[in-house]
A protein has these predicted regions:
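Positively charged n-region of N-terminal signal peptides that target proteins for export
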Residues: 1-10
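Alpha-helical transmembrane segments and their juxtamembrane interfaces
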Residues: 12-13, 118
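C-terminal motif of bacterial Sec signal peptides marking the signal peptidase cleavage site
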Residues: 15-19
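Non-catalytic cap/lid and distal C-terminal segments of serine-dependent acyl enzymes
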Residues: 24-330
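Intrinsically disordered, low-complexity regions enriched in polar/acidic and amide residues
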Residues: 1, 20-26
């Protein structure tokens, strides 16, 4: 009931932005397939996931649970144990330290849990097929959580936890994962993790999308690729305090101050045309696209035709974005 009320209030508040939404939709050309960040159009529609990609692949990757030591960054800083689930591709050999893998961290939305991306029907199979068919290089995929206890803490508690998550990511999750699995990081020191940023991505859905924008704000020096799915930047306030321009101002200033245009970064922003809270993403996209700094080799905005605020849409966003991040031709 609480979620329904919040979504309803969002819709009422953002009706006035309909003109902006229509403006973006008019700009969108036809989908253009799996291309690199240098080739992809800045706006478009996502392509459907082939049904065959949702079936079991002959060569299947593995998913395993990883418990790691962290801290309660929301409350008292006490030592806690958190959980993530890690996908390794077919052929991954724990004893082969010479072969390196790109990595993407994925974050759930409100009420979600670690491992959620592997639970949804067909998504793990899709990862297998993307790799087997050469759409992407073999990669490591981490389905993490911003919840300390891996369970819902209500909307307010969720906001507190995802706002603090970047501390867990930098100090605990990333070192735990990349100290165990063979990524491009030579070690888990901040220096080596930052040096391997071109081989690292972060994405999330709904409140996980908001988390992704905050990861850009806090951890741009650790991550090159970002996939915010159905959500805007809340650096300033809950729902960004409906201050999209102010939040984009912050991002623009960050890019300038940190020379990120030269260092490289790429944001694949996505939402469904029937998503109940799409107005946040559309307003964010409209503001980003209005700035000359955010060219198509740094920011794109794609929509799923008929897509709702659900994991079916998320599956399609991943299918379209991963080849742009980690395509086999890169």
């Amino acid at each position: 009931m609480q979620k329904t009320l919040i979504i309803f209030l969002l819709l009422i508040t953002m009706i006035s932005c309909a003109a902006c939404q229509k403006q973006i939709q008019k700009q969108i050309p036809e989908a253009n397939g799996s291309m690199s960040a240098e080739e992809i159009s800045q706006t478009g529609f996502t392509e459907l996931v082939p049904e065959s990609y949702k079936t079991e692949a002959p060569r299947q990757g593995k998913v395993e649970r990883l418990d790691y030591e962290s801290q309660d960054y929301v409350r008292d800083g006490s030592v806690i144990t958190k959980t993530a689930y890690v996908y390794t591709p077919y052929g991954y050999d724990e004893g082969d330290a010479e072969t390196k893998y790109d990595i993407i961290y994925l974050m759930h939305g409100w009420g979600g849990h670690a491992g959620e991306y592997f639970d949804y029907t067909g998504t793990k199979n899709m990862f297998d097929h993307l790799i087997e068919n050469g759409d992407i290089e073999p990669i490591i995929i981490v389905s993490a959580t911003f919840y300390n206890e891996n369970s819902d803490t209500g909307f307010g508690g969720s906001v507190d936890e995802f706002r603090a998550f970047h501390n867990d990511f930098e100090n605990c999750l990333m070192p735990a994962v990349e100290g165990k699995y063979h990524t491009y990081a030579k070690s888990t020191t901040p220096e080596d993790l930052k040096a391997s940023r071109d081989h690292r991505a972060f994405g999330g859905f709904s409140l996980g999308s908001v988390t992704t924008w905050l990861e850009f704000c806090h951890d741009y020096d650790y991550i090159h690729y970002f996939l915010p799915m159905s959500g805007s930047c809340w650096y300033y306030g809950t729902y960004g305090d409906f201050q999209i321009e102010k939040n984009v101002d912050f991002i623009e200033q960050l890019v300038k101050e940190q020379d990120l245009t030269a260092k490289g970064y790429f944001i694949y922003h996505a939402v469904g045309t029937n998503d109940a809270v799409k107005s946040q993403s559309l307003d964010m996209a409209d503001e980003m696209l209005s700035r000359d700094m955010f060219t198509s080799d740094h920011y794109v905005f794609y929509q799923k035709e008929g897509g709702y605020h659900d994991l079916d849409a998320v599956q399609e966003y991943l299918y379209n974005a991963l080849p742009v991040f980690f395509g086999s031709e890169k």
